[in-house]
Design a protein with these regions (language model features):
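Flexible, glycine-rich surface segments
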Residues: 189-231, 237-238
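Structural helix-adjacent loops and short alpha-helical linkers that scaffold large soluble proteins
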Residues: 29-43, 89-105, 147-162, 174, ...
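Active-site cradle of extracellular carbohydrate-active enzymes
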Residues: 134-140, 144-148, 156-207
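Structural recognition of the beta-strand scaffold that forms the well-ordered cores
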Residues: 15-24, 82-85, 135, 140-141, ...
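Extended ligand-binding groove/face enriched in aromatic
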Residues: 39-150, 154-158
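CBM-like carbohydrate-recognition segments
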Residues: 1-25, 29-78, 132, 216, ...
Length: 328
């Protein structure tokens, strides 16, 4: 079929990235509640569906961006990293080997995306090795450090720290502690700043502090947290009630990933300023950002509305409510 014709036909199923958000959402619900019905949902529905994206025709095996019964699709390292983190969290929650084996399979794929160009780091896409992105390195550090917590293999701790240091050296904005989006092989930096880039670096720094006791990492995490709060929140005056710091309009899933970093840091330094702000935002969103079907818009002020709702946005909201419910 001609590519122009294909453009006119919508995908029958979700791409891997938004589908993976449902894994994160159900994982968070299960961890928050201990309700076995969520584990059943995860095993019998979410993960069964996820296997439709597993590509074993290329080596090493990894998850492709679209289902394996369609034409072969690209494989993105960051897509796989988010899955690896969730499988590792599921293992830490249960000690069931099936989750660990999946995490290890994904880690092998992630390692295949690293080389010495630019002094290290992981590419963004297996088929387009033209840039190394914060989104394929910062969460890879988180993934490695969680794997170390899971099985105490020191190689993961070493790799997690290496990825953290590489990303900090290559992609941090030294003027404000936030992170740029990517660096191309010619050294050109895309200076866009997204919540899902700085958030995992905050989380990785906090994990490194927890695992090493080195205060340098805690200071890093706190600097990133303050910078994120200043950049990704704005002063907001609601029609009723007191002014508060509102999350900027943008990708809600990016915000959910950033929240993971804030929660990790709060559980370490117990500064609740940022968590309180997230709670205010989520309470306000519940009252002002849902449509008649209960689905959320991306504008947390409630003043603009989306014509279409995205699976990943809804999954991100579930994840954030679940995580905040047990963050005391």
């Amino acid at each position: 079929m001609a590519s122009e014709e294909q453009k006119e036909i919508p995908n029958q199923y979700s791409y891997l990235w938004p589908y993976s958000g449902t894994f994160s959402a159900v994982n968070a619900l299960w961890a928050a509640t201990g309700d076995e019905s969520y584990k059943t949902l995860l095993d019998n529905k979410v993960l069964r569906g996820l296997e439709k994206y597993l590509d074993i025709s290329r080596s090493p095996a990894g998850y492709a961006s679209y289902i394996n019964t369609a034409s072969q699709s690209d494989r993105f390292y960051d897509d796989n990293i988010w899955l690896g983190i969730d499988f590792t969290d599921a293992y830490l929650n249960t000690k069931e080997e099936k989750y660990l084996k999946k995490a290890q399979l994904i880690w092998e794929f992630i390692e295949s995306g690293a080389d010495d160009k630019l002094g290290g780091g992981i590419y963004w896409c297996e088929q387009k090795k033209v840039s190394k992105n914060t989104c394929s390195n910062a969460p890879a550090s988180v993934f490695a450090l969680k794997m170390f917590k899971a099985i105490r293999d020191s190689s993961y701790l070493i790799k997690g720290q290496e990825l953290y240091e590489w990303t900090k050296k290559r992609l941090q904005d030294s003027t404000d502690y936030l992170y740029f989006d990517n660096i191309s092989l010619d050294g050109k930096i895309d200076k866009s700043k997204y919540a899902y880039n700085s958030g995992p670096m905050m989380q990785a720094a906090t994990l490194l502090y927890q695992l090493t006791g080195c205060s340098y990492f805690l200071k890093d995490a706190q600097n990133i947290a303050k910078a994120c709060y200043n950049y990704f929140f704005i002063n907001f005056i609601p029609e009723e009630g007191e002014p508060f710091k509102l999350l900027k309009k943008g990708d809600v899933w990016f915000t959910a990933v950033m929240l993971r970093g804030f929660i990790e840091l709060y559980q370490t330094d117990h500064n609740k300023t940022y968590i309180n702000s997230f709670n205010q935002n989520m309470d306000y969103a519940w009252e002002h950002v849902r449509d008649e079907k209960g689905l959320f818009d991306i504008d947390f002020s409630g003043r603009t509305h989306d014509d279409r709702k995205w699976l990943l946005t809804q999954a991100a909201m579930v994840e954030m409510y679940a995580r905040l419910a047990v963050t005391k």
